[in-house]
Amino acid sequence: MSNNDQKRDEGYIEKLVQVNRVAKTVKGGRIFTFTALTVVGDGKGRVGFGRGKSREVPAAIQKAMEAARRNMIQVDLNGTTLQYAMKSAHGASKVYMQPASEGTGIIAGGAMRAVLEVAGVQNVLAKCYGSTNPVNVVHATFKGLKAMQSPESIAAKRGLRVEEIK
């Protein structure tokens, strides 16, 4: 784990993905504020992301962490990897993720790696195409993880057995 990880007493793993300084130009000059992008997960399939904005960096990070805890989703994992290969996009960012065999590790870059680590995925091959803007990459990764379903839930929706859909 890197130095921007934190373990809370609730059992969540928190990661800071990005801190950005933004400026608003007013009559008297510029007003600088900070935005933070964070991801939070329990390492067992629950993961959330949030954005916060404030005049000070710690306050922006705190707001982002709270937003991430409110925005949690449950991901159906297949042990320590994904159920199947998937593509997802948000804005100009496109992501591709596929399951990997045991011992592969997380082969993913930047913002995608942070999301997959806190979600509890330990073996995955992932690639980001197009824009690598961390905000859009995190959104695209979340869209893909949210859309992923286990074979059991797909079979239940179709009224079939798991063996019949494979």
From Swiss-Prot:
**One Gene Ontology CC term in the entry:** small ribosomal subunit
Single GO MF annotation: rRNA binding
* PROSITE patterns (alphabetical): RIBOSOMAL_S5 (PS00585), S5_DSRBD (PS50881)
**Keyword RNA-binding on this protein?**
yes
Q: Which InterPro entries match?
A: Ribosomal_Su5_D2-typ_SF, Ribosomal_uS5, Ribosomal_uS5_bac-type, Ribosomal_uS5_C, Ribosomal_uS5_N, Ribosomal_uS5_N_CS, Ribsml_uS5_D2-typ_fold_subgr
Q: Name one GO biological process term.
A: translation
The record's keywords, sorted A to Z, are: Ribonucleoprotein, Ribosomal protein, RNA-binding, rRNA-binding
User: In what residue span(s) does the S5 DRBM domain sit?
Assistant: 12-75
Q: Which SUPFAM superfamilies match?
A: dsRNA-binding domain-like, Ribosomal protein S5 domain 2-like
UniProt similarity note: Belongs to the universal ribosomal protein uS5 family.
Q: What is known of its domains?
A: The N-terminal domain interacts with the head of the 30S subunit; the C-terminal domain interacts with the body and contacts protein S4. The interaction surface between S4 and S5 is involved in control of translational fidelity.
Q: How does it assemble?
A: Part of the 30S ribosomal subunit. Contacts proteins S4 and S8.
Query: What does this protein do, in the record's words?
Result: With S4 and S12 plays an important role in translational accuracy.
Output this protein's name: Small ribosomal subunit protein uS5
UniProt source species:
Pseudomonas fluorescens (strain Pf0-1)
Gene designation per UniProt: rpsE
